[in-house]
Amino acid sequence: MSIRLTLAAFAVALSTALAPAVAFAQAAPVPVQAPRSPIAVFAAGATHVELPAPNGRTVDLSVWQAPDERAVVIFSHGFNGSPAAYGRMLSQWVGEGFTVVAPLHVDSLRHPHHADYDNQAAFATRIADLAIARGFVRATHAGKPLIAAGHSFGSLMSLIEGGAVTVAGPLGDPHIKAVVAFSSAGDLPGVIQPATYADLHTPTLMITGDADLVEGYVTDWHAHRSPFERSPAGDKMLLVFAGADHSLVRNADEADFDLMLRTTTDFMEAYGLGDAAARARLDALTAPEGVSLERR
């Protein structure tokens, strides 16, 4: 079945079921910060690829090519966000040999046609964007391992790519070797089902904080534990930072950022590349004060 037909089915089947996802998107805070020079430099370094999408859309892919490419990360930004906003982390991954390919979703405030789409469109168009991005990577980076990563609403997308099954049905990609999820979209009623994570066998690293809330919607940070707790045991890790909020991936202090960088890089090397030394570092990792680390 083509992506176009699949998305047409989504538009009908999910019109009411995805209302909680819309509520989350409307409630999710959108940080407003003056651009920092390193981020601006990172954004300017992207190659942009425009690809056709269903219903006459085009998808803008930001591609940050690693000089010595070892694998490719498909990254999905948070609601209303944009790929370059995560330059602090993504630039480090690129330096470690992970090319980053990141679509600009229609819910982004930087999308040129943002006003043409309501929040209801965010879910289905994101699914299509990421399928197109993966197809692009398979065609242009043939043979390179694929890793899915994302933040907030984008982390839900990465979990779906890794095998999580929402009300939309199974949409996972068996080529995904590992998932790195910063925060999550929480337990969205009507979208996240009791068995949503039952088939999430892909190695998954979940990163959150005990102040990771979305005002008026996610009132208990423990909801971000669900992908870790409700997926099959084996190759799952959870990092929880004391006092960290929903923007941890962007606003972490140097010590927390360094831990996230080391852990995500080792995780991608261990499971994306089959690197035994990286796996040994993960196994030996201990959490510093103010951070909890769980494995299952």
What residue spans do the PLM features occupy?
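An N-terminal hydrophobic leader/cap segment in hydrolases
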Residues: 10, 14, 18-63
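Serine-hydrolase catalytic machinery in alpha/beta-hydrolase-like enzymes
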Residues: 46-143, 147
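The feature captures the conserved acid-bearing segment of alpha/beta-hydrolase catalytic domains
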Residues: 171-243
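Alpha/beta-hydrolase-fold serine-hydrolase catalytic core, especially in secreted/extracellular enzymes
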Residues: 243-245, 251-296
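Glycine-rich His-Gly loop
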Residues: 75-79, 152, 209
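Alpha/beta-hydrolase superfamily serine-hydrolase fold, recognizing
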Residues: 28-41, 66-68, 139, 144, ...
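Primarily recognizes the serine-hydrolase "nucleophile elbow" in alpha/beta-hydrolase
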Residues: 135-199
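Bacterial N-terminal signal peptides that target proteins for export
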Residues: 1-10
